[in-house]
Regions:
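Catalytic donor/gating beta->alpha subdomain of glycosyltransferases that bind UDP-sugars
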Residues: 192-217, 246, 252-316
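Cell-envelope/extracellular polymer assembly enzymes that use nucleotide-activated donors
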Residues: 76-78, 108
Length: 404
């Protein structure tokens, strides 16, 4: 055997002996219970680091420019907005932000008003004098025959004059004047475009927790979208072509009032036809309509579609949140019941995980335009497992408003 090979063999034996001695030391001092606890904690930490460094790292490091071009320039687009209430504040503020977008190609905004207020509809039509590219369509409200968002969107898509469609809602406003430009240019690299939607920043801890929850939930589907396994997008900020829409005969799951941004997308999304706009100026900002009760109700309502998600997507979410929860519980067990040096080791593992988590959260926040993330993130990190547990428990009961 050559001298170098002998030296490597001796080094391997030395390392193996040291490892065995260390394991024997742990077993002798902490018993099999302590050894098992240590192994479980290390395994859970490894799972957590894999998700936050590798899986979510794809979001932070994603570059849409690496995807193949299918168009040489941004296309003409139609922005579809369903409207189910007489929100005069929307006409005075958020609609102006939509109409004032800077976009090199022609664009139109199609508002589908579902209601019975003729004065409001007239006000909408009067806006066309100021904005010639505004198209207004009305569906008469009838309490005996409720109109769903999908039905309103279908009318809007048929009314649109352009092939490329962008869907948003009256609850959201663009983060910048370049929102439409960012989304439109993304059509150059895919027939489906996905954008991020933030929650409107406000003062207070509740708003912070809701904002971080939105970012975390979005990270789940963004991580799969950038890895060419799209299963959903933001209902306030996504686009597709008319050809794709009519190619599958429109929206599915018509017995549900939700699903346009996930169940429909699952039918049309392929590995090579999705473009992801991950820049702050391409985001939308959703208005926060309430506190934590509103947010949990929001998760419950749209969580009705969760059962129809691909197994791989559901398993990934549950493994991540499950491993986080178990890691916290095993670490707490170590901190309460184990000797001082074991407690110190558990604390080091907790700190190691948190550093990885907060650094990744900050890098993703930078990509999507979320601000003020890092300093209070430990609060959300502790609270999130409980919030997700409550959301899963609530999903065991059917939300009748999500079904027709």
């Amino acid at each position: 055997m050559p001298f170098d090979a002998k030296r490597v063999s001796l080094q391997n034996r030395f390392i193996l002996n040291k490892v065995m001695q260390y394991i024997d030391y742990i077993v002798q001092h902490y018993g099999w219970q302590g050894t098992t606890l240590a192994v479980v904690m290390l395994t859970l930490l490894a799972i957590q680091l894999y998700y936050h460094i590798v899986v979510y790292g794809r979001v932070a490091n994603f570059r849409n420019s690496r995807r193949r071009k299918i168009l040489d320039s941004e296309p003409a687009v139609s922005v579809i907005i369903p409207m189910f209430s007489e929100d005069y504040n929307y006409l005075d503020t958020r609609l102006h932000d939509i109409m004032g977008q800077q976009y090199a190609a022609p664009f139109e905004v199609v508002i589908v008003y579902v209601g019975s207020d003729n004065d409001y509809f007239e006000e909408l039509n009067n806006m066309r004098l100021r904005y010639p590219n505004l198209v207004v369509t009305k569906i008469q409200y009838n309490p005996r025959f409720p109109i769903s968002v999908k039905m309103a969107l279908n009318v809007g898509i048929k009314s649109a004059h352009n092939e490329h469609i962008i869907i948003t809602t009256s609850d959201a406003t663009p983060a910048s004047e370049q929102w439409l430009s960012t989304m439109g240019k993304s059509f150059k690299r895919g027939d489906i475009v996905l954008g991020y939607t933030a929650i409107e920043p406000q003062s207070g801890l509740t708003n912070y927790l809701i904002r971080m929850s939105r970012m975390q939930i979005s990270t789940y589907w963004l991580a799969r979208a950038v890895n060419r396994s799209t299963y959903r997008g933001s209902r306030h900020n996504f686009g597709f072509t008319k050809s794709l829409y009519f190619g599958v005969k429109g929206f599915t799951h018509l017995n549900m009032t939700i699903g346009e941004n996930d169940l429909f997308l699952q039918r049309i999304a392929k590995r090579n036809n999705v473009s992801v706009a991950l820049v702050p100026k391409g985001a939308m900002i959703e208005k926060q309509w309430g506190g934590m009760k509103w947010w949990m109700s929001h998760l419950h309502h749209f969580g009705e579609a969760y059962r129809f998600y691909p197994n791989a997507a559901r398993n990934a979410m549950e493994w991540e949140i499950g491993s986080q929860t178990l890691f916290f519980l095993t670490s707490l067990t170590a901190l309460i019941f184990m000797p001082l040096e074991f407690k110190a080791a558990a604390l080091i593992l907790l700190i190691t995980r948190y550093i990885a988590v907060v650094l990744r959260a900050r890098s993703i926040a930078k990509r999507v335009g979320e601000k003020g993330v890092a300093l209070k993130y430990f609060i959300f990190d502790l609270f999130n497992p409980l919030m997700m547990l409550c959301a899963r428990i609530s999903m065991m009961s059917k939300d009748s408003t999500a079904w027709k």
